Amino acid sequence: KKKNIRFIGDPQKRIEEDYLRIIRFIRFKIMYDTKVELTTSDIIKQNLDGIKKISKERILIELLKILDIKNFLNINQNSNLKEIFTKIFPEFLYLNRLERLKKVYNQSEFNRDILLGVLLIDEKDNHEYFLHKYNASNKIKNMLEKFSKNLIKLKNDKHFFEKDLIKNAYLDGKNHLIALNLINFSINSKVKEKDFLKIFNKVLKIKVPVFPIDGEYLKQKGMKEGQSLGKVLKILEKDWINNNFKISNERIEEIIKIS
């Protein structure tokens, strides 16, 4: 039998002391999968405006803790809790996508980055509003923007997970592609589970190439330390990638001379 979860002391007083306790209360409710007393739920709803008095930084810290809880995937099963959560975080427009994510998330490591991508990204830049509202870190910003950019690429490029797979794994990493596949499946109802699994297994099996040239190699070829060395490395790497991760000694010499 599930236990009720409640505030210690008078809920109204405890909430008024620090409105962040509302979000913490939700976190514990999700973590322990416990019931919320109706009276407690009503008091929380009556005090939701108080959350506006809390700094966005403090709210974001609590939100990220919530998204780290695996039980968050079941939030749609509790209409009362879902209602409170969506009133606090109205930018999470796509909680319904969790139902598709639940079908496949066991295939890879569950993490908050995937959840943020699933719940925020759409074709209207909803994630950008979230980033601005909560003054999110550069790490979160770069992660969401990378997911958004590659979801657009994936939509427009039928070769993204096919002949360009190794190239994309080299550029963005296998973990990113695994997460991207999960997000794309959750967002796009047209993607079949068997196709998701096919891509997932392909990503797992590929061996990511290692660029064989570094600064020391170029110095041995007579180049000096400086900006030009870094520039040549980038040109060589691009040529190597575009030539199916191969480059001849003759081509290396040619690029060094041109540069």
Where are these regions (language model features)?
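Conserved, surface-exposed functional patches that form binding/active-site neighborhoods
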Residues: 6, 12-13, 182-197, 213
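C-terminal accessory/binding modules appended to enzymatic or scaffolding proteins
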Residues: 191-234
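Glycine- and charge-enriched loop/helix tracts that form the active or gating conduit
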Residues: 1-132, 227-228, 232, 236-240, ...
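Hydrophobic, well-ordered secondary-structure elements that form the walls
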Residues: 148, 218, 222, 243
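Structured, non-catalytic alpha/beta "coupling" segments that mediate domain-domain communication
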Residues: 65-88, 168-192
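Short, mixed-charge aromatic SLiMs
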Residues: 45-58, 131-153, 202-209, 258-259
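Divalent metal-dependent catalytic cores for phosphoryl transfer on phosphate-bearing substrates
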Residues: 99-190
